Amino acid sequence: MKKMNWLLLLFAFAAVFSIMLIGVFIAEKSPAGIIASIVLVCAVMGGGFTLKKKMREQGLLD
């Protein structure tokens, strides 16, 4: 069984939460919140993919 990578799991949950925030701000009709949530999704997803690439290059991922 493979070892669980908790940091990547945290990034995944943060991305899901950010996507949920987009829906909340759409319901509240808050353009600033929608834009902030979209920026947050891009930042979290980008950070997660960057971290995964670095870990793969270092041989920490299978």
Swiss-Prot record:
A single Gene Ontology CC term: plasma membrane
Pfam family, one: DUF5325
Keyword Cell membrane set for record: yes
Alphabetically ordered keywords of this record: Cell membrane, Membrane, Transmembrane, Transmembrane helix
Record localization: Cell membrane
Superkingdom, taxonomy of origin: Bacteria
Stretches that traverse the bilayer: 7-27, 34-51
UniProt-recorded name of the protein: Uncharacterized protein YlaF
Organism: Bacillus subtilis (strain 168)
Name of the gene encoding the protein in the UniProt record: ylaF
